[in-house]
Amino acid sequence: MGAVDERQRAIDTAVSQIERMCGKGAIMRLGEGAQNVEIPVISTGCLSLDLALGIGGVARGRIMEIFGPESSGKTTLALHVVAEAQKLGGLAAFIDAEHALDVNYARKLGVQVEDLLISQPDYGEQALEIAEILVRSNAIDVIVVDSVAALVPKAEIEGEMGDPHVGLQARLMSQALRKLVSSISKSRTCVIFINQIRMKIGVMYGSPETTTGGNALKFYATMRLDIRRVGPIKDGQEVVGNRTRVKVVKNKIAPPFREVEFDVVYGRGISREGDILDLAVESGAIEKSGTWYSYSGERLGQGRENAKNFLREHPDLLGELERKLREAHNLRFSPGPVTGAGE
């Protein structure tokens, strides 16, 4: 017992010395209530994706990456997170490195564009410095960087068109993330990096796809979402949206590799009513008999599109279903925008 007591005194002395040198809380025992701390989250605006992420949304104080092919819904998903943060009274910033943000589309997704901070930086270093200053302010809830591929190093912009700049962007991302990750972890800010896909040349086995900006973001990101279009959604012959699949390829705080599918409607973003309808059918809250959908003995419509339209025209019923689904999965209720039937 004497050896154990001596070892305990030694570690207590070391802990006291570390706290004097680095401040209170620099080191602690993991069992001191840490396991009961709930990770604060922001909803993605898509209940099925919130469930797939395992904690009810995207984590605050963490880095997240959304990547996929062109026009797959990357920016749409990020803007939905911004809208959800604003509904909770939070502030958001959009670093538009691509100089391509559609303000009218953002407004249709529920983003309060009047309150959205936007920056269109001239080069990559400037974009990441802006992100760091915003994180350090500890006043921003969500920062979206769109996109990593557009974070062009200053040396490349100032050089000639044909000059070789091997590894410049990867070094920029690696250096910036080393600085950013510490600031982000001490804040309540979720930083979302949107990334594009490139093809590796000469790959014989495995996927030839890779993301831009080197490997640093893959390591530092708490969550990585791979978003893809599955197929078109048609109204008669007219294509009105896309069926979209998201795979959680990395998740440090819940089981990864979960997949979800939902509708993305042109001009409206993620179809909340379609997502809740699918989850309600899966859970048994809505009965599906043949092509008919029913809830508590009341018919919602024949066919999925008619049932979706019924829910869209009856926001109270939609809210009731979402509340039940969230309660069943122990998630806090986050009401969506109430849209009129004719919108």
Swiss-Prot record:
Which GO MF terms are attached to this record? ATP binding; ATP hydrolysis activity; ATP-dependent DNA damage sensor activity; damaged DNA binding; single-stranded DNA binding
- Note the superkingdom of the native organism: Bacteria
One GO cellular component term of this record is: cytosol
Stored SUPFAM superfamilies: P-loop containing nucleoside triphosphate hydrolases, RecA protein, C-terminal domain
Q: Name one GO biological process term.
A: DNA recombination
UniProt KW Iron-sulfur keyword: no
Alphabetically sorted, this entry's keywords are: ATP-binding, Cytoplasm, DNA damage, DNA recombination, DNA repair, DNA-binding, Nucleotide-binding, SOS response
Tell whether RNA-binding is among the UniProt keywords.
no
Family, per entry? Belongs to the RecA family.
What biological function has been recorded for the protein in this entry? Can catalyze the hydrolysis of ATP in the presence of single-stranded DNA, the ATP-dependent uptake of single-stranded DNA by duplex DNA, and the ATP-dependent hybridization of homologous single-stranded DNAs. It interacts with LexA causing its activation and leading to its autocatalytic cleavage.
Question: Cross-referenced NCBIfam families, in alphabetical order?
Answer: tigrfam_recA
Record's protein name = Protein RecA
